[in-house]
Amino acid sequence: MNKISITLIITLVMLMTACGTAKKATVTNPTGNTTQQTTVQTQTTAHYDEIIATLGTWQTMQTGGSLTIDVGSSFSSGVQVRMVRDEAIFISLRPMLGIEVGRLLITADSIYVIDKVHKRYAAEKVSLLTAGLPITVSTVQDMFLGRPFIIGQGTLNQANKEKATLTNDGAVSVLTPNDKYKGYSYVFTFNKSHNITSLNITPASASTSAYQVRYSNVKKTTAGNIAHTFRANGTVGKKRLTLELNYNNIEWNGSVKIDHSLPSSYSRVNANQLLNLFSN
């Protein structure tokens, strides 16, 4: 149980910094037959609109669920998840009888991990994870809920859709943001019902994704279509990591309590030291 909180940090590092450095390169799409382009553009606009129509607005969410982590050995825990849009993500680990053994809190500028088993905590600037990228709490919230986003632009919407390219073969739609961060690209895929199915992060030198999030159990809610199963895969150092987060029914826009307090009697640990436990 002592590794669960650490692994949560690592998973966030894997997902938030895999796009590489803050330097970006803009990809220009090739030109072609004007008539063909017009037809494709009309189809693409329709698919864009249908995908965007599935994305609602929300202010708060809270739910219970389960978390399974495999990083050489596997462990599972019940969880409580709470979010305030643009402000905070709170995950409480409760493996037995609803007793909290650890928690993770991400705010606009900081990340906190509390390990109640060993009475220690880590408190770091969120820049530890973002490495200079314009990634916000909202970006991570979108990632956890299965909502497509464009780094630096927010959730996909009518105003920013031109900053990505959408292709469709009738069964699968692929959304590729135009701005690529040096060394990596990231793409979203959707099924024919316009539900998100994956987020793939791929190094420029590779033909397959190095980091992948699979989304399933997508449900229509008051906040739009939300994936209730989130499964992330990737490699951290020499270790293969898999994390699966399953949500129960989500309560939206209610009163949510986010505990920002840090236990004064706990010892503070450098988060980089925790990360190094899994880097070899």
Regions of interest found by a model, annotated:
Residues 23, 88-142:
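An acidic-aromatic
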Residues 72-85, 89-98:
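Structural recognition of beta-strand segments within beta-rich domains
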Residues 75, 105-106, 207-212:
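Amphipathic hydrophobic-ligand
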